[in-house]
Regions:
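Catalytic-site signature of metal-activated, phosphate-bearing donor transferases
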Residues: 2-164
């Protein structure tokens, strides 16, 4: 957390105008800030009154639901979630398994387009439309591993339906 964000949080808590506050995250990957790839607009609620907010039941990427007014803090939160490539891919593997379980619990069955179209679309969307290409090699790595994670999600879902480990 930066000094500026810390000061803003302290100031906000002295006279809160909302029950929850979004913080824009500054995404870093493999030692460099990612400015595109669809990750530049990442914001999450990180400051909230627990009496008016609750997380949903998602197994991964839980969402905090605020029952009241929200606002956004001005300062950004540096986000260093993936310190190494291996750390990033390990997290993608865990998330793909959890997302597959969520789909399985909803009764969604994998179809051919899940294996072919969805990963391809994820890569094209993240690398070209969300300008990951402007993040250089890191943008390519993020788009490629993200697309593979989508593919792996549906392989995991297919395995769940067949009771294969």
């Amino acid at each position: 957390i930066t000094k500026q964000l810390s000061q803003e949080i302290i100031s906000t808590l002295k006279d809160p105008k909302a029950i929850a506050y979004y913080v824009n995250r500054e995404f870093h990957f493999m030692g460099k800030q990612i400015k595109f790839s669809g990750l530049q607009n990442d914001n999450v609620i990180r400051l909230f009154n627990k009496n008016y907010c609750a997380y949903n039941d998602n197994l991964v990427h839980e969402v905090l639901k605020a029952n009241g007014k929200t606002a956004t803090l001005k300062n950004k939160l540096p986000h260093y979630t993936y310190t190494t490539f291996d750390n990033y891919t390990a997290k993608m593997h865990r998330y793909s398994a959890l997302k597959a379980k969520m789909l399985y619990n909803k009764g969604i069955k994998p179809k051919g387009y899940h294996f072919f179209f969805r990963p391809w679309y994820r890569f094209i969307n993240q690398y070209f439309f969300k300008l990951g290409i402007l993040d250089g090699k890191r943008g390519f790595i993020l788009a490629y591993t993200s697309a593979f994670s989508v593919f792996k999600r549906y392989v995991n879902l297919w395995l769940l339906y067949r009771n294969i480990k």
